[in-house]
Amino acid sequence: MVTVEDVWRAQRARGPATVLAIGTATPPNCVDQSTYPDYYFRITNSEHKVELKEKFKRMCDKSMIKKRYMYLTEEILKENPLVCEYMAPSLDARQDMVVVEVPKLGKEAATKAIKEWGQPKSKITHLVFCTTSGVDMPGADYQLTKLLGLRPSVKRLMMYQQGCFAGGTVLRLAKDLAENNKGARVLVVCSEITAVTFRGPSDTHLDSLVGQSLFGDGAAAIIIGSDPIPEVEKPLFELVSAAQTILPSSDGAIDGHLREVGLTFHLLKDVPRLISMNVEKSLVEAFQPLGISDWNSLFWIAHPGGPAILDQVELKLGLKEEKLRATRHVLSEYGNMSSACVLFILDEMRKKSAEEGLKTTGEGLEWGVLFGFGPGLTVETVVLHSLCT
């Protein structure tokens, strides 16, 4: 007679969740950060705000971003003038864009990940889709299932409005799904488009202007599963542990509100300090079981919320300059793509490690950490174990 415990044990994987493939995608429209202030103030009919434009130029100069990719072209913005105002009712126009474009960009990234994985898409058992760009029913997960031609029985989870920490959240959820469902292959997709947050400048809301200088569009897809099939699947990283916490005294530090005017973001100046003051506690809790306390012995993937956050984390932990190389590179080349960012960094790291002939996917090191920071303030901490390149 089979018992419930027998069934339960048979459903569990033997080994840890493993990253099996990564794919990324961006819209074709590339924006040069050095010329963006002129373009932004022209397209939003704000060229008369000379002092504000100078402030925005300084923000862009300090951002450490060279270029970003954006779905919103000049033509699209000219056709949707309300999107260019600071607080005009424009949610319908924004929603019409993102409902179509978010799953479409996600499909591009997912197709690349599936190709690298090299297995039939019919073997995907679960789909986790994450976006902060718009809301719809049925969701972007449903649309992507249709676009990719996944099985109707694929088990879907849709995550809306999580924000910048969610690149860590999706890995935590995929880890639980893969390890608790034998043979599961989880397709994780984060797709972000700034059409929902773009707006003109305001003298009274400089925090909104900070967002306009940082955010870019991008989608990343990862396939995760336990017990990789030898000679068939190529494991890249193992997900060893994952945790989430709300930082103390951080209420209101990062807020986002979906309104008639789109998605508004509010940031306190204190965000870099709040994160840097609390990051070591998360590290200690994550790595104490492994006996690791030298943060420079790890490879690092940190959400690049902005250069000030990275600088303060680096300073607080005494990190060597090269530790955040992959993170700073992605910030420079793509801007802040919210939930997709850490997955882009993971991709950059494994590719660079292979190019440089390093022995592991984690810059030649064995252990690493992935940090996501976002509204709450919420922090996601994922412990990674690299594998041979």
Swiss-Prot record:
GO biological process, one term: flavonoid biosynthetic process
Reaction catalyzed: (E)-4-coumaroyl-CoA + 3 malonyl-CoA + 3 H(+) = 2',4,4',6'-tetrahydroxychalcone + 3 CO2 + 4 CoA
EC category name: transferase
Cysteine disulfide partners in this protein: none
GO MF terms, alphabetically ordered: naringenin-chalcone synthase activity
Positions of the catalytic residues: C164
Keyword Acyltransferase assigned: yes
Pathway where this protein functions: Secondary metabolite biosynthesis; flavonoid biosynthesis
Domain of life: Eukaryota
Keywords of the record: Acyltransferase, Flavonoid biosynthesis, Transferase
SUPFAM superfamilies associated with the record: Thiolase-like
Function statement: The primary product of this enzyme is 4,2',4',6'-tetrahydroxychalcone (also termed naringenin-chalcone or chalcone) which can under specific conditions spontaneously isomerize into naringenin.
Family (UniProt): Belongs to the thiolase-like superfamily. Chalcone/stilbene synthases family.
Protein name: Chalcone synthase 3
Organism: Camellia sinensis
Lineage: Eukaryota, Viridiplantae, Streptophyta, Embryophyta, Tracheophyta
Gene that encodes it: CHS3
